[in-house]
Amino acid sequence: MSQQKQKQCAPPQQCCPPPQQRCPPPQQCCPPPQQCCPPPQQCCPPPQQCCPPPQQCCPPPQQCCPPPQQYCPPPQQTKQPCQPPPKCQEPCAPKCPPPQQCQTSKQK
């Protein structure tokens, strides 16, 4: 009896259709062109990379800016609290430690 590529899934896991690939239990199924992303996300196309939650998928020219690390916009570096990074940026803006605030380099 030739065994087909059918694997029994444990209760925490689920089976995906043959064209799709199975992701870890917290995740679901992703179509073959897409790749599995860590949970809270689901799938991202192959050229794009997975980003943390406030973000999703970013195109290859752009990067995912880490949500825990905040940044200040390059044109406006004032004494204001750092704001969370956008979904995707081509160059990630300069990072600013959360306890500190972004300041302009004072030239005296």
Curated annotation (Swiss-Prot):
Q: Where is this region: Disordered?
A: 1-24, 73-108
Any GO BP: positive regulation of keratinocyte differentiation
Designated name of the protein: Small proline-rich protein 5
Q: Give the protein's biological function.
A: Positively regulates keratinocyte differentiation by inducing genes associated with epidermal differentiation.
Organism annotation? Homo sapiens
Q: Give the Low complexity compositional bias ranges.
A: 1-13
Q: Where is the composition biased (Pro residues)?
A: 14-24, 73-100
